[in-house]
Amino acid sequence: MAKKDQEFVKDITNMDEDFPQWYTDVITKTDLVDYSPVKGFMVIKPYGYAIWENIQAFLDRRFKETGHQNCYFPLLIPESLLNKEKEHVEGFAPEVAWVTHGGSEKLAERLCVRPTSETIICSMYSKWLTSYRELPYLYNQWCSVVRWEKSTRPFLRTSEFLWQEGHTLHETAEEAQAETLQMLAIYKEMAEDLLAIPVVDGRKSDRERFAGAAATYTIEALMHDGKALQSGTSHNLAQHFTKAFDITFQGRTGELEYPHHTSWGASTRLIGGIIMVHGDNRGLVLPPRVAPTQVVIIPIAQNKEGVLDKAYEIKKELEAKGIRVTLDDDTNYSPGWKFNQYEMKGVPLRLEIGPRDIENNVAMIARRDTLSKDSYSLDNIGDTVKNLLDTVHTDMLERARAHRDSKTFTFKDYEEFKRKMIETPGFAKGMWCGEEECEAKIKEDTGVTIRCIPFVQENLGETCQFCGKPAKHMVYLAKAY
């Protein structure tokens, strides 16, 4: 075996001893990404991109089912457009990358590489919209954005990342709010039904909301190490951008009106979430519905008569059920090496078939999530595997929920909160006064932020547990990626 192959299946860093190094080991050894010559710009390799494609497919289907259309807007945005919404430009100014020259000629106006597309899209909407009859505008684009980050980590925080961003216009405030919450619900559905990641949904505090938004809503997931990951956001932008960009339409009474505006997005950081919620010390553990390969078939003693034929027959039967299958008949590697390889890559099910199995009309199937292995009849193997994949998804979601709940705590006072955040980091549930000064002090003292004001509220007391003033909300707090 070549040295490179030996390195590939070698143990990775223990996640409980050095979680950041564990994460780096996993993303590189499983061939998800590589580092490019430009700091903060990652190369997403085919295996990593296939995961993104499955996320795309789920979201794209749900967007279209809810009436949205895909389109594409330019990468470069004139500085004058970016400056039109004051709060927005101030929020993004430190992260903007600028184009100053075209060839050797200096441009008359700087162009920013889009950090997000509200401004360029609103400039076009102002040209297009004339009447209430044209509303709503329900547009989405799949693209990359650039935010010049100082500290980067693949998938979690990179200077360039892939995402989708939806931008909609509505006749009324009520319709815009309904859209904002509908899209957040789709993100929650995606997290739980596709990625097997339980999330807390709610509203961001004013301090944490999107620059230029009236309100930002979020889904928050908890990683293995007790840090939170913002996994999708939906913004009610009210009329902030439509007024700044003079987007008007003739209303039902004949008067000119400003439409109500939303935007919402999810990105490749979701892949980082999958890794950190489900992974273990053997590598990736991929939820079946997002895994590029759901089942790998490994023939045992494949040189024996009938083994490969049966393996391909099983592959065909599984594919007929819509299951994504890889059959590894490469004779350069032993079955044991393949077992290690596909475990590290997180393939949900491994099906082994050899002469004795064929004789007994069975196959051995190993689950990546539990590392258990059992014998299953080859009769109706397609239905058996399909049901097993659903079981794996359900079990992974419930394990992740149990882990999150075990790392969610309440506290009697600020001192206990600070101590628990150091000793047993996770989600803290506490009562908060709603004041920005109090929130800023929490972050300054501890590095912890309010992740959201959850839709489902609990009354844990009448006073703010951080400053003693009357409490307005129960909030979730955590350190975050």
Swiss-Prot record:
GO terms for cellular component: aminoacyl-tRNA synthetase multienzyme complex; cytoplasm. Keywords: Aminoacyl-tRNA synthetase, ATP-binding, Cytoplasm, Ligase, Nucleotide-binding, Protein biosynthesis. Coiled coil: none annotated. Transmembrane segments: none annotated. InterPro entries: aa-tRNA-synt_IIb, aa-tRNA-synth_II, aa-tRNA-synth_II/BPL/LPL, Anticodon-bd, Anticodon-bd_dom_sf, Pro-tRNA-ligase_IIa, Pro-tRNA-ligase_IIa_arc-type, Pro-tRNA_ligase_II_C. It catalyses: tRNA(Pro) + L-proline + ATP = L-prolyl-tRNA(Pro) + AMP + diphosphate. It is found in: Cytoplasm. Its EC number is 6.1.1.15. CDD domains: ProRS_anticodon_zinc, ProRS_core_arch_euk. Pfam families: HGTP_anticodon (PF03129), ProRS-C_1 (PF09180), tRNA-synt_2b (PF00587). One of its GO terms (biological process) is prolyl-tRNA aminoacylation. Catalyzes the attachment of proline to tRNA(Pro) in a two-step reaction: proline is first activated by ATP to form Pro-AMP and then transferred to the acceptor end of tRNA(Pro). Can inadvertently accommodate and process cysteine. Misacylated Cys-tRNA(Pro) is not edited by ProRS; this function may be provided by ProX. Belongs to the class-II aminoacyl-tRNA synthetase family. ProS type 3 subfamily. Homodimer. Consists of three domains: the N-terminal catalytic domain, the anticodon-binding domain and the C-terminal extension. This is Proline--tRNA ligase. It comes from Acetoanaerobium sticklandii (strain ATCC 12662 / DSM 519 / JCM 1433 / CCUG 9281 / NCIMB 10654 / HF). The gene is proS.
